[in-house]
Amino acid sequence: MTEEFDTTGVCTGTWWSSSNGMFSGCSLPRSAEIVVDFGEIEWQNIDTLDAKTYNENYLSTSTFLGNANLDTTSQIYVSSPSNIHEEERYNQINSFLEGLFDSSEQLLVPNCPKPELFESFHFFDDVFPNESRMISVFDHQKPKEDMQACKSLTTCKRASEKSGELEDIESSQPLKRPRLETPSHFPSFKVRKEKLGDRITALQQLVSPFGKTDTASVLHDAIDYIKFLQEQITEKVSTSPHLNSIGSGEQKQWSDKSSNNTHNQNCSPRQDLRSRGLCLMPISSTFSTPPQHLDTSSLWN
């Protein structure tokens, strides 16, 4: 069979090896027309071929698309006008091809491989991506190592941002000055804080036999009682010789101290007691001092 194809002069090795030889054009076979005429077609270089002539020749040529289930050793037989007498030899092949193809079928466009002309341009490398690029594009699932690396980078970035924010906050806060406490030369005394209500209750207990509980009356009676005590003390000091000598000595000391002042220099013992403060005495010691015309029992009734 191969020898018969060599004698035709058309089916050479270069024609079978080209990428466009078998799939350059597709046409359905007919029951009465199987042979392809290549007698008037001249193969030219595709680089110098004009687009118009290329399209005309492309439409004029017709080849057969073999079925995918055919064996790789199946071949297409081509004859020229000079070898018409050999048509009878190929009746068996024609009958076989008639059973494969139907005249009512439409034109099928094969998946043509990438032409050799486009391989010289880098632009068409992106148009016809290879299998490795398609896998890399559609492979959306990243490996676990890449995911862990991304997570570690994000955590490190967040930690650095938080540390920077803390440093900014610390730098913005003003420094507190240390509190300097000067040691006092005087010892700390605990001052007893007494409320005014506590003092009033004490005065109420003092003048409670009179039966008065309001604040104004209690204060008035307390003042009168204090004046009475002062008068009793002055009278007792004046009548007692021992107390008189002590009072006279104290009066002299007080007069010496007050001589530098602008106040009156003739001070009485009553003023001396006021300067020292009020000293309360028990009631039992005052019974002998009051005058006889004063009845002390009437004070407590």
Swiss-Prot record:
Record-linked PANTHER family: TRANSCRIPTION FACTOR BHLH103, TRANSCRIPTION FACTOR BHLH83-RELATED
Superkingdom in the source lineage: Eukaryota
Residue ranges annotated for the bHLH domain, each copy included: 180-229
Biased composition (Polar residues): 239-269
CDD domains on file: bHLH_AtbHLH_like (cd11393)
Subunit relationships: Homodimer.
UniProtKB keywords: DNA-binding, Nucleus, Transcription, Transcription regulation
The keyword Nucleus is assigned to this record: yes
GO cellular component annotations of the record: nucleus
Cell compartment(s), UniProt: Nucleus
Species in which this protein is naturally found: Arabidopsis thaliana
Region (Disordered): 161-184, 239-272
Lineage: Eukaryota, Viridiplantae, Streptophyta, Embryophyta, Tracheophyta
Primary localisation category: nucleus
Tissue: Mature root endodermis.
Molecular function GO labels: DNA binding; DNA-binding transcription factor activity; protein dimerization activity
SUPFAM superfamilies: HLH, helix-loop-helix DNA-binding domain (SSF47459)
Protein name in UniProt: Transcription factor bHLH103
Domain (KRAB) ranges: 29-106
Classification via PROSITE patterns: BHLH
